[in-house]
Amino acid sequence: MHFGIPSLFYLYILFSIIMRIKCVITKNLKKTKKRTCSYIPHGNMEKGIILNYIEKPNPAYLKRGKNKNKNKNKKGDIYKLRNVEILLYANRYVHEGNENFSSTTKKLLLTPKVGNKMPEGKKPDWFHVAAPTVAKYNKLKDDIKKLNLHTVCEEAQCPNIGECWNIGTATIMLLGDTCTRGCKFCSIKTSSNPLPPDINEPFNTAKAICEWNIDYVVLTSVDRDDLPDGGASHFAKTVELVKFSRPDILIECLVSDFQGNIDSVRKLAFSGLDVYAHNIETVKRLQKYVRDKRANYDQSLFVLKTAKEINPQLYTKTSIMLGLGETKEEVIQTMYDARKNNIDVITFGQYLRPTKNHLSIVQYISPQMFEYYKEEGLKMGFKYIASGPLVRSSYKAGEYFIKNLVNQRNKDKKN
């Protein structure tokens, strides 16, 4: 086809117009995307200002670095923050503020994710723990190794291992060291087909516990969905052997949900244990982000409620990790749900990321907030609450729980 000079000129004009339109569209898209971000005044975190900037994003902001003074807004100096930062600030108000304005900030609810940016700055001072005393620590470690046992203290990289092992307390992990589930917060190794349970484990566990001469022991396990009863009979046999050797000892069993199998729950509930524990782990909204897809909030509550109904003499217990993006309102609601299902004891601790392949921490919760949750929980009627940054489900379980039981018993005698 032959084009004359006028035709080429018109094609050039048409091409220029198309490119111009494309540039305008691209620019508008970028501007639209930019305006969907939220901006807040740096150093001024008042509730009203946060909500104002969340609902009506202002494109005027103060860039970090050079040309600061050229980008001032009538409302004050504005810093452009990434979405994750603005959400973190807003969540702090929802989590720690006196007023509840979560309805306005529903779209800001945070979720944890592997690989997300961790909170800035060094780890708070309250996470510093003392080094273990060598003698007691080594003795306990040798006993566990000699009897081919596993502890959740080691497998889950618990920060309190030195403190607990120094006083001769360990949480023994039954059914091997490999879990059939893959929760995103847990460092225990996983497999869909782990080795069969060690038939000598119940006997070795009873032997170790008798040698340690302790008053309270916690038995836990990995999830074993590959076993017909989830490992309930193995648990029950261990409890029976320990109680036969030491009838006076108090036994807490921190178990899986057994996939909601009532027969498994019944088997364990009548084994002779004193405390039936199963962890909810997090608030309802965050379950799918934190736990394996086979676990869920309602099933966990059902298992604890069923255990109590089967054997009313049992104490039931659960635990929640904080710092995964939950709000204060959600934590309070979780406590209400636990009490509604007749759970006696609840513990709160700060989630700490085991490795970079696990969920990032969304927020460090202050000791004051842990104390607040404890006070609120006691008002709801929990028999005992352990709440603090380094508290874990099994952390000083005997010391806390026995002390509470004694106090409650003495109070009942007076009445």
Curated annotation (Swiss-Prot):
Gene3D superfamilies: Aldolase class I (3.20.20.70). [4Fe-4S] cluster 1 binds at residues 153, 158, 164, 394. It is an enzyme of class 2 (transferase). It catalyses: [[Fe-S] cluster scaffold protein carrying a second [4Fe-4S](2+) cluster] + N(6)-octanoyl-L-lysyl-[protein] + 2 oxidized [2Fe-2S]-[ferredoxin] + 2 S-adenosyl-L-methionine + 4 H(+) = [[Fe-S] cluster scaffold protein] + N(6)-[(R)-dihydrolipoyl]-L-lysyl-[protein] + 4 Fe(3+) + 2 hydrogen sulfide + 2 5'-deoxyadenosine + 2 L-methionine + 2 reduced [2Fe-2S]-[ferredoxin]. [4Fe-4S] cluster 2 binds at residues 179, 183, 186. Transmembrane segments: none annotated. Residues 1-23 form the signal peptide. It holds the Pfam family LIAS_N. The keyword DNA damage does not apply. Binds 2 [4Fe-4S] clusters per subunit. One cluster is coordinated with 3 cysteines and an exchangeable S-adenosyl-L-methionine. Its EC number is 2.8.1.8. SUPFAM superfamilies: Radical SAM enzymes. HAMAP family: Lipoyl_synth. This is Lipoyl synthase, apicoplast. The gene is lipA.
